[in-house]
UniProtKB/Swiss-Prot annotation:
GO biological process: intracellular protein transmembrane transport; protein import; protein targeting; protein transport by the Sec complex
Binding site for ATP: 99, 117-121, 631
Keywords per UniProt: ATP-binding, Cell inner membrane, Cell membrane, Cytoplasm, Membrane, Nucleotide-binding, Protein transport, Translocase, Translocation, Transport
Keyword Ligase: no
Subcellular location as annotated: Cell inner membrane; Cytoplasm
Gene expressing this chain: secA
E.C. code: 7.4.2.8
Catalytic activity: ATP + H2O + cellular proteinSide 1 = ADP + phosphate + cellular proteinSide 2
The protein's name: Protein translocase subunit SecA
One GO CC term on file: cell envelope Sec protein transport complex
Membrane topology category: Peripheral membrane protein
Length: 969
């Protein structure tokens, strides 16, 4: 029935395209009408359209004419020179109908999926122009500084011709320059630049003059799937150096390395023993049918199953798994030990290991033997694995009648400090083990200039300045014997998911979005529209070729490269990691095939390598760096011989990454072909392939070196990828649910901070805080289960300790209610502050004369104090929230929902934050002392309460570090 309705009415995509096509026809009609206008008359259209918008005409109504203006300008500029990145090139682009259609979709808030070479950059100019007519902030978000600069110079020339201003945010631009850029009609920049400016404005700026942004109206995100999905879990963090090094990493690194080495030796021994027993059978296509022989083989496979739980990448294990029958036996033991009735036997078997490694979930677990080894041989402590039950310990202290109240407080402080130390030690141990067991050099990171540089798993690009969180980066630094740097302290943070939700209107463009359409809809309320290509795609997509072993796969890849290379076709070989790219490079050198390598280690030569990749006979080995945002242009000879051939050495866990790699060839009607080579030892196959696929391997194993190739295998691979994508989507959604809690708190604090910065009557805000604190403290003390008279001395003692204020106890006793007492205390405190403020004004006037604005100076002092304590308490709150987030998962043991627990406890923490901010502000305001001489200039009395910031090459795009002037680094 649904299929019938779809055939009758068309799919939602078809209906949307049909509706937008009518608007395209209107644009073309206006384009013809604008042709007779002079250049000056066409330029004046911008002012005319702006005026019509201000008079109430909607952007939707003006769209056909505005888009026609842009199209007409593009046609008029054909052949004129444009300087892009220091090079002169002639303008040669006029939007096709499909580009106009994509531009309409973007204005309507769609994500447009346009194939490589279809002109996404030009398409974006039309909605940018239309929305800039409002005078509100319009941003084009790119994936790197180079593209932002290029697009601003290149297609931004159209906007400038029409009288609009354009600017580009480049990392490291000074404050005044950034303010000037944000005043432009259209601003180009990366997600991190826009995001960090938002965080700076709301957490670092100490005056309105230091804030650069002017709001969030409309944004178009280029490579939107990369930014909103691949980077979704990576928060933007402004941080500064911590107060001190965490000594745990220095103390434990050698001990952890020793424990991991013991595990490695144990697994190697088990694997070699199994290898000796199976040596005779490895070259047999079919195993013997003898029952006793099979039982013996099965026992050796049981040992290898144990090795797979301790060292999943053990070489002997991988060699044995090349045999389909032996692989099936190992998998059979895995199924056996996963059965509920065999759990005890599984635990007993796994207890032989020191550490159990769960490669599928990227996790690990110390066994009892591992813990015992840690305590006895590695010099660790049993207390590393036992956390203190704080509630129980506090209850014991409270019930100990031999302790005085002061002793009880001191004992609780000591217990709390011991708990903190144990948690820090246990956390450091866990991160060091993770660094050794799960993080691979040249896969997850590279070592460069005594630093650990993260490799982006989706793009293959190095990420200098970005650091793994929660101490993992320091653990890797200790593993690789590079300088262990200080832990950073977070000043401000936001995820890209919540940052882009700040915009009133959002749109995007990419070559691969349809596979993630569900996530775009549910998380961002964005629909995906696939825009037809201008020319038919001539790419030949071959079926994947499957090989039993990695060795056979690489042999086939080299043969394929040699065969294609003979004809002169340029070849792009995509690899999943730096390690694989270097391995393949060595194999090609052995076969005397000239080639170029592009990976995270030589990314500086990227532009040069990509420029040559489309030439006749070129062979380029690249990581995912070449899979997105690169436009490989063919020379004429390469087109004649059949265009670029893309070879994938494995399937990525995301279908989008594979589609991006395929999309490097056959752009804009050029010829090309793509083929992927896989082995059953690939990570995707090992961890996520279905049992059905393993059964097929056993029954249809071809002779060694021959490939299996069938659309059925492609379907099974796609199923595995969908399974991984679904899991990753769940993780991202889960992360967002937690971050949404933090986001509401962030918005509240930033709103309060901006109110303090912008308020013309800061004195009233200060008095409001004083009133809140007085009412809160008085009500808290007076609401105890004592007669009111008993609580009044405590209230008097607290007020005398915290503020220079003497209470009249007898007057308070005569008041009729607790509320009346609280209000009286608040009035007294507010009056005392009024007197202090007046005396400060008099002191400054006496010291500096009547020519200075003493009242304004005092207000600036109050503003600075309030901002300082908002920032300090917010930083502490961020640490508390991180700790809560890391611990709340354990609540599942008590049959509690961690998310609900997190929401509840984070609310309590936030209430505590608001209270602590107000108390800190009020105490500081009452303790302000002015020390001046008549020679001092009045502006010197304003305290400096914020650190300066730098953004240099040492601090990369995802974490911005704040360096105070006094820091010795």
């Amino acid at each position: 029935m649904l299929d019938f309705l779809k055939r009758f009415f068309g799919s939602s995509q078809e209906r949307t395209l049909k509706k937008f096509q009518k608007l395209v026809d209107k644009v073309n009609l206006y384009d013809e009408m604008l042709a007779p206008l002079s250049d000056e008359e066409l330029r004046n259209k911008t002012g005319e359209l702006k005026k019509r918008y201000q008079e109430g005409e909607s952007l939707d109504d003006m769209l056909p004419e505005a888009y026609a203006v842009v199209k007409n300008v593009c046609r008029r500029l054909t052949g004129t020179p444009v300087e892009v990145s220091g090079y002169h090139q002639n303008w040669d682009m006029v939007p096709y109908d499909v580009q106009v259609l994509g531009a309409i979709a973007m204005h309507k808030g769609f994500i447009t999926e346009m194939q490589t070479g279809e002109g996404k950059t030009l398409t974006a100019v039309m909605p940018l122009y239309l929305n800039a007519l409002t005078g509100k902030p319009v941003h084009l978000v790119t994936v790197n500084d180079y593209l932002a600069q290029r697009d601003c110079e290149w297609v931004g020339s159209i906007l400038r011709w029409l009288g609009l201003t354009t600017g580009v945010l480049i990392s490291g631009s000074p404050l005044e320059k950034r303010k000037e850029i944000y005043r432009c009609d259209v601003v180009y920049g990366t997600a991190s630049e826009f995001g960090f400016d938002y965080l700076r404005d709301n957490s670092i700026a100490t005056s309105v003059d230091e804030q650069v942004g002017r709001g969030f109206y409309f944004a178009i995100i280029d490579e939107v799937d990369s930014i909103l999905i691949d980077e979704a879990r990576t928060p933007l963090i402004i941080s500064g150096p911590g107060e001190k090094h965490n000594p745990v990493y220095f103390e434990l690194k050698d001990k952890v390395a020793e424990l991991v080495q013991l595990q490695r030796e144990l697994c190697n021994q088990l694997a070699l023993e199994a290898r000796r027993g199976l040596e005779h059978f490895l070259d047999m296509d079919i195993l013997p049918k003898d029952k006793k022989v099979i039982e013996g083989i099965s026992e050796f496979c049981r040992s290898l199953w144990l090795v797979s739980k301790g060292m999943p990448l053990n070489r002997v294990l991988r060699r044995v798994r090349e045999h389909p029958d032996l692989r099936a036996m190992i998998d059979k033991w895995d199924t056996y030990y996963h059965a509920e009735q065999n759990k005890e036997e599984s635990i007993e078997k796994l207890s032989q290991l020191y550490i159990i490694v769960d490669e599928h979930n990227n996790d690990f677990e110390l066994t009892d033997r591992g813990m015992q080894q840690w305590v006895e041989k590695a010099g660790g402590s049993a207390e590393d694995f036992v956390m203190i039950d704080m509630g129980h310990e506090y209850a014991l202290i409270d019930s100990d009648e031999s302790l005085s109240p002061t002793d009880k407080i001191n004992r609780k402080i000591a217990v709390s400090e011991e708990d903190t130390q144990r948690k820090a030690r246990a956390h450091g141990l866990r991160q060091l083990l993770r660094a050794h067991l799960l993080m691979e050099r040249d896969v997850d990171y590279i070592v460069r200039n005594d630093q650990i540089v993260i490799i982006d798993e989706h793009t293959g690009r190095p990420q200098p300045g970005r650091r793994f969180s929660e101490g993992l980066h320091q653990a890797i630094e200790s593993k690789e014997h590079v300088t262990i740097r200080k832990e950073s302290q977070t000043f401000a943070t936001i995820t890209l998911q919540n940052f882009f939700r700040l915009y009133e209107k959002l749109a995007g463009m990419t070559g691969t979005a349809i596979t993630e359409s569900k996530e775009f809809k549910e998380i961002y309320n964005l629909y995906v529209l696939q825009v037809p290509t201008f020319k038919t795609c001539l790419r030949i997509d071959h079926n994947d070729e499957f090989y039993m072993t990695e060795r056979e796969k690489y042999h086939a890849i080299v043969n394929e490269i040699a065969r294609i290379h003979k004809d002169g076709n340029p070849i792009l070989i995509g690899t999943e990691s730096v390690e694989v790219s270097e391995k393949l490079s060595r194999i090609l050198k052995q076969n005397r095939i000239e080639h170029t390598v592009l990976n995270a280690k030589n990314h500086a030569q990227e532009a040069e390598i990509i420029a040559a990749a489309g030439k006749l006979g070129a062979v380029t080995v690249a990581t995912n760096m070449a899979g997105r945002g690169t436009d490989i242009k063919l020379d004429e000879e390469a087109v004649v011989v059949g265009g670029l051939h893309v070879i994938g050495t494995s399937r990525h866990q995301s279908r989008r990454i594979d589609r991006q790699l395929r999309g490097r060839c056959a752009r804009l009607g050029d010829p090309g072909a793509a083929k992927f080579f896989l082995s059953f030892e690939d990570r995707l196959m090992r961890l996520f392939a279905s049992p059905k696929l393993n059964a097929l391997i056993r029954h249809f194993r071809p002779p060694e070196g021959e490939a299996m190739s069938d659309p059925m295998f492609n379907k099974l691979i796609e199923t595995a990828q969908k399974r991984v994508e679904a899991r990753n989507y769940t993780i991202r959604k889960h992360t967002l649910e937690y971050d949404d809690v933090m986001n509401k708190q962030r918005q509240t604090i930033y709103a309060f901070r901006n109110e303090v910065l912008r308020s013309e009557d800061i004195f009233a805000l200060a008095k409001e805080s004083i009133n809140h604190v007085a009412l809160m403290i008085a009500s808290l003390i007076m609401s105890r289960e004592h007669p009111a008279g008993h609580s009044l001395p405590i209230l008097e003692e607290w007020m005398n300790y915290s503020f220079p204020l003497q209470l009249n106890i007898e007057e308070l006793r005569r008041l009729p209610s607790l509320d009346a007492i609280a209000e009286k205390v608040a009035d007294e405190l507010t009056g005392a502050f009024q007197n202090k403020f007046s005396s400060m004004v008099e002191e400054i006037t006496a010291a500096a004369g009547n020519d200075v604005d003493a009242n304004g100076i005092c207000k600036d002092i109050i503003r600075s104090v309030m901002i300082m304590h908002i920032d300090e308490q917010w930083k502490i709150h961020l640490v508390d929230m991180d700790l809560l987030r890391s611990e709340v998962g354990l609540r599942t043991v008590g049959q509690k929902d961690p998310l609900l627990e997190f929401k509840h406890e984070s609310f309590l923490l936030f209430e505590s934050l608001i209270r602590d901010i107000r108390i800190a502000i009020v105490k500081h305001l009452f303790r302000l002392e002015l020390t001046m001489t008549r020679e001092q200039r009045p502006q010197n009395v304003i305290p400096v309460v914020a650190t300066s910031f730098q953004n240099d090459e040492n601090f990369g795009p995802m974490e911005l570090t704040i360096i105070s002037d006094s820091d010795d680094e």
